[in-house]
């Protein structure tokens, strides 16, 4: 079972922190064997944990002290429902209203197109089964291993040309970088039909 795939992280490149992978699986194993959490409930809480730990950078920085604190906290946890409640509590402390109102939008407005917040957005799109631009197929279909050989089956394209954005008053590099959509690679070589060509 691939917990990260079920949380929407269908490729290793979408996970910014390898520590998040290791310690999320450690928590999964502790929940399964130590606390005997039911399979359905355990998968649900660990998927939430994966999402929280990857987009907030939970395991970056002083990872050892964070993990030691977790293990110390778990000494006071004795039952399956307490284990789930503990993880929900840590998630809730990270995913506050302020996080969603201020921190996350600021992270998504970053000039980097490869931030943990952006990868979290892609993971959410995968989980929700959202179709790609100009396609009825979900984005997740194009992350399936072997779907397109070694070739990248997802391509990013700008929605509006940079010159047009500058003309209407947008001259911020963040806007230029975020002004894109994922489209299937096979369609990326096909030029979009203009109004003139469709009229003729």
Q: At which residue positions do the language-model features occur?
A:
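Short secondary-structure subsegments characteristic of cysteine-rich extracellular domains
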Residues: 38-54
């Amino acid at each position: 079972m691939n917990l990260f795939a079920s949380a929407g992280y269908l490729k290793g490149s979408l996970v910014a922190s390898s520590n998040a992978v290791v310690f999320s699986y450690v928590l999964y194993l502790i929940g399964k064997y130590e606390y005997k959490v039911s399979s359905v409930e355990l998968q649900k809480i660990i998927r939430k944990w994966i999402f929280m730990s990857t987009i907030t950078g939970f395991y970056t920085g002083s990872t050892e002290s964070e993990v030691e604190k977790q293990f110390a906290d778990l000494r006071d946890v004795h039952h399956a429902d307490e284990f789930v409640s503990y993880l929900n509590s840590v998630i809730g402390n990270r995913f506050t209203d302020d996080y969603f109102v201020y921190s996350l939008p600021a992270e998504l407005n970053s000039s980097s197109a490869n931030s943990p917040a952006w990868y979290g957005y892609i993971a959410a799109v995968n989980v929700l089964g959202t179709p790609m631009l100009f396609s009825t197929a979900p984005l997740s279909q194009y992350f399936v291993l072997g779907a397109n050989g070694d070739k990248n089956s997802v391509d990013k394209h700008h929605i509006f040309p940079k010159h047009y954005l500058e003309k209407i008053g947008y001259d911020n590099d963040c806007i230029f970088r975020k002004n894109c959509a994922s489209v299937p690679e096979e369609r990326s070589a096909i030029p979009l039909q203009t109004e003139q060509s469709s009229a003729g």
